[in-house]
Amino acid sequence: MIRYRLLLFLFLFPWSNHRSCFAPPTARIHVTRTRVSSSSWLFPHFFAKLQFLFLQNYLCILCILHPFIVSITLKYPQKSQRSFATAAPVSPVARSHKVVVVGGGTAGLAISHQLLRSGKFAQDDIAVVDPSMWHHYQPGWTLVGGGVKTKEDLRRPMHDLIDPKFKFYNESVGTFLPENNSITLGNGDKVNYEHLVVVPGISINYGSVKGLPEALANPDSLVSSIYGYDTCDKVFSTVEKLQKGNAIFTQPAGVIKCAGAPQKILWMALDYWKRAGLYNPSNPASSPINISFATGMPSMFAVAKYGAALEAMRKERGVEGLFQHDLVAVDGNKATFARPDGQEQVTRQFDLLHVVPKMGPHAFVKDSALANEAGYVDVDAGTTRHTKYANVWSAGDASSLPTSKTAAAITSEAPVLVHNLLRSMEGKATDAVYDGYASCPLVTEYGKVLLAEFKYGGEPKETFGNWFGIDQAVPRRSFYHLKKHFFPWVYYQSLVKGTWAGPKGWTN
């Protein structure tokens, strides 16, 4: 455990001599290289000399991390050559498995691999069902929108991530038949199970905003969204093109993936325009660009501690707050917002519009016997077990777990689900309880992140606050390294392979 904390500590270390490395690709214009005061450092006295001697160049990160990465690789060696999982051929014959996992996203891969690593399953005992050809690291699309990552670098072929010991059905799901312990695939085949894990994520409904699909598809429009692979790289080009006018960033009412993401791209765009001389936070009225945040929610963030910090930041930086403004239509350069309680709709003119569409459960989940009234898989908030069918489980975005829908949440949900499922297979009572942990590394500018961590009830549960006594509501450069470098690396290196448990570190 000490090794893992040392690794994380290196990402927490202040890199004050390299402000330019945080600038957006084309916005490294004339940024004044001012040194951050020692009051913002985590350990200003003990490591000042170490910083001077060894950390003058940002590339030293790789040199310092090398022995730790090597030690981790030795502890969890990868096969020098691995065979690909093969998709099951089309056949009308019913197949049976001990566990069927519906979904090959973050939750599906983490859970299926954790089950396999238990050593209790033979070849084809576990089946994974997913129609996708590619797996995407979706939290990275914010960085694509900010111009610091490419979307191609953040995806992997699905077959490369599926262990060859799994039976992989590269198909959609037609129906759930929980009374018969089976599902039907999109091609009509039937698959039987002893236990079912339903983790297909949620769908993004671009059609929920009238005119949005057409605006996104128009290469000449300055309308974009970080929430899709086909649109996330359009975001930065729109930010670059805007020289003056009104920029509006939206967030819908209701459930979405990572409720902090709509703000992340706002703050990165603001910082870009600030560096380009197009926005002055201290005097926004005189700036060529005006910035508004239109959210269907009543506040900046649902967790009170971080919501207060972000509201103070909004006011300090001169961003207009349009609360309980839910985008319903885009027509040319006009955006129309619904208001609560029958109030009259509001129409605003824009020159740039970043849209977060409404989201919700897939129809094959919503219309099934597994769903609650809202359409999510109805599970116990602690055990992740279905409230009606004892051999059905769910986690992640598709579940009814009343917490934020983030990849970080899955790092805590998956071990609980796997532990309880295995005990259930042995005829034992479930005894692991999920506490609602979730996290949102909220980028507040190029080079700084506010690291929100919380559990059920909106109560902060801060990893580094506990370890080092720091306030994670204060944006820090060290957290930016986690967001930009560490999290994408550990995601594909460990999380989807079932060996990363978030704040608890690596697992066997």
Where are these regions (language model features)?
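N-terminal mitochondrial targeting presequence
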Residues: 1-95
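FAD-binding core/adjacent interface of flavoenzyme oxidoreductases
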Residues: 66, 77, 83-96, 166-275, ...
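Beta1-alpha1 glycine-rich phosphate/pyrophosphate-binding loop at the start
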Residues: 90-167, 255-304
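A Rossmann-like FAD-binding core segment of flavoenzymes
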Residues: 121-125, 164-175, 270, 274-374, ...
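Short glycine-enriched, charge-decorated loop/helix-capping segments at active-site entrances
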Residues: 141-148, 213-214, 221, 370
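FAD-site-proximal beta/loop scaffold in flavoenzymes
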Residues: 208, 216-243, 350-412, 422
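Internal hydrophobic alpha-helix adjacent to the cofactor/substrate pocket in enzyme cavities
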Residues: 410-435
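C-terminal auxiliary extensions adjacent to catalytic cores
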Residues: 451-508
